[in-house]
Swiss-Prot record:
GO biological process assignments: amino acid biosynthetic process; aromatic amino acid family biosynthetic process; chorismate biosynthetic process
Organism: Streptomyces avermitilis (strain ATCC 31267 / DSM 46492 / JCM 5070 / NBRC 14893 / NCIMB 12804 / NRRL 8165 / MA-4680)
CDD domains in alphabetical order: SK (cd00464)
GO molecular function, one term: magnesium ion binding
Domain of life: Bacteria
Oligomeric form and interacting partners: Monomer.
Keyword field: Amino-acid biosynthesis, Aromatic amino acid biosynthesis, ATP-binding, Cytoplasm, Kinase, Magnesium, Metal-binding, Nucleotide-binding, Transferase
The protein's name: Shikimate kinase
Residues reported in the UniProt entry to bind substrate: D35, R59, G81, R136
Length: 171
């Protein structure tokens, strides 16, 4: 069994994909995103899965994708924003180098706006995002070895902060 060098968690729009690719590049390893794994395996977008099947079906698909990626991938891994909702997934993350990328609501609204591709924020994104974070923040913190705030920082700066937080050296 392989183990990811870094696992990134955090809300939608925080920059897990962008930062994850930069961290992987700096470490000289591969990058993987479980949202991409889901889209590839299912042959449709996450938004389509939500609309066609509902959130419970999506969460079951996501759980399988995360468990597979944690077992197979030895680089940098980004998880979907809601992956930490599953207790089994949180238990699997124990012992991994997990970094919670955080951001405040004003930054989140700037980044996610009214994007229709984000089904959980389709109506009143500011309120929805606050509610999601109230439900999830403690779960992100529970699984994380480090927390890196992304507000007002560019992806390069956040990537460096992730490396610094985990005391990892660039390749």
């Amino acid at each position: 069994m392989t183990v990811p060098r870094v696992v990134l968690v955090g809300p939608m729009g925080v920059g897990k994909s962008t930062v994850g690719a930069l961290v992987a590049e700096r470490l000289g390893c591969a990058y993987r995103d479980t949202d991409d794994d889901i889209v590839t395996a299912e042959g449709r977008t996450i938004a389509d899965i939500f609309v066609d099947e509902g959130e419970p079906v999506f969460r079951a698909i996501e759980k399988r994708a995360v468990h597979t990626a944690l077992a197979e991938h030895d680089g940098v891994l980004a998880l979907g924003g809601g992956a930490i909702l599953d207790a089994d997934t949180r238990a699997l993350l124990a012992g991994h180098r997990v970094v919670y990328l955080s951001m405040e609501v004003d930054e989140a609204v700037k980044r996610t706006g009214l994007n229709a591709a984000r089904p959980l924020l389709a109506v009143n994104p500011r309120r929805q995002w606050r509610e999601l974070m109230e439900a999830r923040r403690h779960l992100y913190t529970e699984v994380a070895r480090a927390v890196v705030a992304t507000d007002g920082r560019g992806p390069e700066e956040v990537a460096q902060a992730v490396l610094d937080a985990l005391e990892l050296k660039e390749a």
